[in-house]
Swiss-Prot record:
PTM annotation (2,3-didehydroalanine (Ser)): residues: S145
HAMAP family: His_ammonia_lyase
Catalytic activity: L-histidine = trans-urocanate + NH4(+)
Keywords: Cytoplasm, Histidine metabolism, Lyase
Modified how: Contains an active site 4-methylidene-imidazol-5-one (MIO), which is formed autocatalytically by cyclization and dehydration of residues Ala-Ser-Gly.
A molecular function GO annotation: histidine ammonia-lyase activity
Covalent cross-link 5-imidazolinone (Ala-Gly), where: A144-G146
The keyword Chloroplast is assigned to this record: no
Family: Belongs to the PAL/histidase family.
Protein name: Histidine ammonia-lyase
Gene that this polypeptide is encoded by: hutH
Lineage: Bacteria, Pseudomonadati, Thermodesulfobacteriota, Desulfobulbia, Desulfobulbales
Length: 512
């Protein structure tokens, strides 16, 4: 496990969250947050002693909020809440998703507005540091009142119930606790609700979608530049004068990055004074399209970063005011909307490379051998690889349909508008996988095209990119089993093998 990250409640950075998403990282709580945590517990105790009726502390839940629960049943109320709400279905989330969800929940609870004891938060920290991850089904949340079912499955392990995993091994919840050196916890008033209310599952998926979108974006900048050179496209549309007069910062930044990637290309110099006037849009309009995508990524990073540090519990404990107030911070509409926008960006990041691959295999458009292989007819080359890219791009168009407008009332109409944020964010991972496949195919096609331009070379940065590809996939001199080549190139995309070739200032979590 890597060195520990100190959780300063409400101040987790995207760079820290990226680290946690990629590999197990130990955490510890900042010492000075503990006083506020303890004070919130004292406030809950004082409210109970005063005999005040507060939702979720001494009442039922949802439509049953008007049912008053006697003090001697308050512990049972919290246990029952978690058991009944652990009702998710489907395949379990990846450990990386659960790891993020746990970190986000710890971060939120540690801000001291939830009335949950320090020992419960520390138990989550201990589970996380032991790499014992609750087994959480992917489906069952509508993103309001928070991610109830996923967080119940996360929390049920603290009771010694449910299931967990440890380095690929499936365990019972009790076995997971023992492995982490813990015993089952008896929850106090409000603690079950504090664990369950929140947007941490939706936000964990959204973070993973954001990080994947950034890596796809970086790769698409590289693969698009390779395709431009392979097709003898012009750099003139990337001239800063063009982008300055439009004024969109992300477009300006993207155009600058393209210029940097293409600088000192021998191929480009060889046709600098050719008669071609305008390239097809998939080459010429890359700064405009990718700039718009970058704008969505940057906006999503801002919103998701805020939500990752938010208190999304209900009700909230305000110690200074000696008050506990019911509200709606559990409603994940901000995540749902930015996830929808990220879906559009991921689809568009994949749409351009599919079109460029189609251009490269068309000898009339690219001037390269048909389907990028010698002895066409005997060899089919990249013919069906482009069909695969088209299939993936089309699938992404369907997956990009907005989820945030698709509300359904729940809990006997008490919860009559919900966000659907969990699905909105979860489908980003499938879309990102599709786009990684499209980019893998473009990388192979573009590198093939560059090799056909030998002895001329592309730019130094793009030669480095081609070298990365050629380390795992050889030149395609005749037809061979192509699926493993695509898989190997896709693994490069998903590992962020090309991230270092674009400016670290371009993408949000690369530089925070």
């Amino acid at each position: 496990m890597n060195s520990k990250i100190e959780i300063k409640p409400g101040r987790l950075t995207l760079a820290e969250l990226r680290r946690m998403a990629k590999a197990p990282v130990g955490v510890r709580l900042e010492e000075k947050c503990k006083g506020k945590i303890n004070a919130s517990v004292q406030t809950v105790g004082e409210v109970i002693r005063q005999g005040r009726v507060i939702y979720g502390i001494n009442t039922g839940f949802g439509l049953l909020a008007n049912t008053i629960i006697p003090n001697e049943e308050l512990e049972h109320l919290q246990r029952s809440l978690i058991l009944s709400h652990a009702a998710g279905v489907g395949a379990f989330m990846a450990d990386s998703t659960v790891r993020l969800m746990m970190v986000l929940k710890i971060n939120s609870l540690a801000r001291g507005y939830s009335g949950i004891r320090l020992e419960v938060i520390e138990a989550l920290v201990q589970l996380l540091n032991a790499e014992v991850y609750p087994s959480v089904p992917q489906k069952g949340s509508v993103g309001a009142s928070g991610d109830l079912a996923p967080l119940a499955h996360m929390s049920i392990v603290l009771l010694g119930e449910g299931e967990a995993s440890y380095r690929g091994q499936r365990l019972s919840g009790r076995e997971g606790l023992e492995l982490a050196g813990l015993s089952p916890i008896t929850l106090g008033p409000k603690e079950g609700l504090a664990l369950l209310n929140g947007t941490q599952a939706s936000t964990a998926f959204a973070l993973q979608g954001l990080f994947a979108a950034e890596e796809l974006f970086a790769t698409a900048m590289v693969s698009g530049s390779l395709s431009l050179d392979a097709a003898l496209g012009s750099r003139r549309p990337f001239n800063p004068l063009i982008h300055a007069v439009r004024g969109h910062k992300s477009q300006i930044d993207v155009a600058a990055s393209y210029r940097q990637l293409l600088e000192h290309s021998e191929i480009e110099r060889s046709h600098k004074f050719c008669e071609a006037v305008q390239d097809p849009y998939s080459l010429r309009c890359q700064p405009q399209v990718m700039g718009a995508c970058l704008n969505q990524i940057r906006n999503a990073a801002e919103v998701i970063g805020t939500e990752a540090n938010a208190v999304s519990d209900n009700p909230l404990v305000f110690c200074k005011e000696n008050d506990i107030i019911s509200g709606g911070n559990f409603h994940a509409e901000p995540i749902a909307m930015v996830a929808d926008n990220l879906a559009l960006a991921i689809a568009e990041i994949g749409a351009l490379p599919e079109r460029r691959t189609a251009l490269l295999i068309d000898s009339h458009m690219s001037g390269l051998p048909p389907f990028l292989v010698d002895k066409g007819g005997l060899n089919s080359g990249f013919m069906i690889a482009q069909v695969t890219a088209a299939a993936l791009a089309s699938e992404n168009k369907s997956l990009a349909h907005p989820a945030s407008v698709d509300s359904l009332p729940t809990s006997a109409n008490q919860e009559d508008h919900v966000s659907m944020a969990t699905f909105a964010a979860r489908r980003l991972l499938e879309m990102a996988d599709n786009t990684a496949g499209i980019l893998a195919i473009e990388l192979l096609a573009a590198c093939q095209g560059i090799d056909f331009r030998a002895p001329l070379k592309t730019s130094p940065l793009l030669e480095e990119a081609k070298s990365i590809v050629r380390q795992v996939v050889a030149f395609y001199d005749q037809d061979r089993y192509l699926a493993p080549d695509i898989k190997n190139a896709q693994a490069l995309v998903q590992a962020g093998a090309f991230n270092h070739l674009v400016s670290r200032d371009l993408l949000p979590s690369f530089n925070r």
